């Protein structure tokens, strides 16, 4: 057992020991009390990119620092088996609809298109034509929470919907600060575009892409540094920023803090969705944090890039500001106005880390793939008095599609009728309340990709299955050559050993057959598109019932 795993085991044991004490000592929430809900989503943050041991079974970074998110993990429950789609746009579509990409209101399988094979490669399968946005008849998570009396807000990356008024007109967003990370402006008569930093436009002055963020676009000055960044510094020198353009991540933090201050006085609860653009490429952190990491020696061979480390901590500092605002909304030092005790905070990432800037080891590969490095991410839920602090669920798998029904149950909102919009996700509210460690009827996850994405993805379908003995398995099916891969994730986190590769046992074959039939049934039920063969324009068939028998030798 590694030192990281020993440390993680102690954390789990501590959580088990204190759980009964917490159950008896904490004041139970009123069953009718509606919490505020804050959902924070990082962009491209990998499973091992936090320094907390809770979120990654002890494999957290020894170079990157995330003390504020680590504090959130200590105050809440982390999930070891938390999953997403393979990249950002389909994850965001799944989040807001509660549906896999096969859902009637969804249809978003990839960023941009499924026709993204590497240049010059002739593919045997002609990809499916996907949707690029959620359908306008989609009843979004925002709309459902509004029916329970929630004020809704969106701060950050938009993806999966059309930007602008449509977020308000058919997605149910009351306060809209959704935007790109790029800002276009005319500076000294020249049209320019940059990422992450405010621009000083000749006509508009300091600005980001949308007007709702303009009040927070001014350069860093002494007053801001003293009031905002000095109290949260962590070995960095924020005064290096004086007079430089504002970073988008800080500006979004400013907007969220202002929103919390305003809503803390309201009678109705709020739902704030905060999908930060950090830590997506281009890797452009604040220079004070980059200076810190350039001077710091990495003790983690997986993680050595100073600018990426700085970007992770910039994200972390902004999360810390959000958490601090919940404890002291008006920022006067008196926490009597705090709303943290009645606010659920969730931290999540939209997909696995992008290898190059970071490394997802021990997980296999990266964003864009269905191996664990592409779809397994940190996940934390905090809700004082309901969720046991410093706890880790190492059994229940959770997917993006589960957030919608989970938050609806917590908010006391009714889901859309299945005749209007069928939910693929299932609520894990009972698991959060520790009425059980798992939902017995929630032990399968599916992914389906009817197209191409450079070298990372090809037409395939995948099932994650939790066996009755709580062992987690994952089966891949590739349409081009009708091949399978099977991994035991509980024993082989890095997906290094394909159990079907060499002389599989009868027990292994039986399991693969069972998982294949579950996958096949799901594909048929959802009428999942598969594309057509280029050679004859015929529809690519689903995996055959007994296809895994070819591995019998």
From Swiss-Prot:
Q: List the coiled-coil residues.
A: none
Q: How is the cofactor bound?
A: Binds 1 Ca(2+) ion per subunit.
Any one GO CC term of this protein is: extracellular region
Q: Which cofactor does it need?
A: Ca(2+)
- Per its UniProt entry, which superkingdom is the organism in? Bacteria
Q: Which family does it belong to?
A: Belongs to the sulfatase family.
What is the recorded name of this protein? Answer: Sulfatase
- Tell me the organism: Formosa agariphila (strain DSM 15362 / KCTC 12365 / LMG 23005 / KMM 3901 / M-2Alg 35-1)
